[in-house]
Amino acid sequence: MTRVKRGNVARKRRKKILKLAKGFRGSHSKLFRTANQQVMKALRNAYRDRRKKKRDFRRLWITRINASARQNGISYSKLTGQMKKANIQLNRKMLAQLAVLDPQAFAKVVEVASQAQ
């Protein structure tokens, strides 16, 4: 059986980690052990925050819709209920965009939803 020297494998593994740690501050991008810890932490945070981003955006949309709805004299929960009755199928993202970019159109949506009781 031939002898396997692991120098190349180890160097490749360490280079991969240091490449991922590029841009980190201080020893976090220079020393393998600290770089490895920071890369693992960064990957953990990235995984968690990809899921958290969806919740954050939904909360932002609801906040924006609620603010605009209250300017039009109705609460968010009542607006969503009336929109369901009026069969208006705009999702929260679209409604929030309307509320920010085109307040007149949003007011029209509120008006149409309010009439369908």
From Swiss-Prot:
One of its GO terms (biological process) is ribosomal large subunit assembly. SUPFAM superfamilies: Ribosomal protein L20 (SSF74731). Pfam families: Ribosomal_L20. Keywords: Ribonucleoprotein, Ribosomal protein, RNA-binding, rRNA-binding. One of its GO terms (molecular function) is structural constituent of ribosome. InterPro entries: Ribosomal_bL20 (IPR005813), RIBOSOMAL_L20_CS (IPR049946), Ribosomal_protein_bL20_C (IPR035566). The keyword Protein biosynthesis does not apply. Disulfide bonds: none annotated. GO terms for cellular component: ribonucleoprotein complex; ribosome. Binds directly to 23S ribosomal RNA and is necessary for the in vitro assembly process of the 50S ribosomal subunit. It is not involved in the protein synthesizing functions of that subunit. Belongs to the bacterial ribosomal protein bL20 family. NCBIfam families: rplT_bact (TIGR01032). This is Large ribosomal subunit protein bL20.
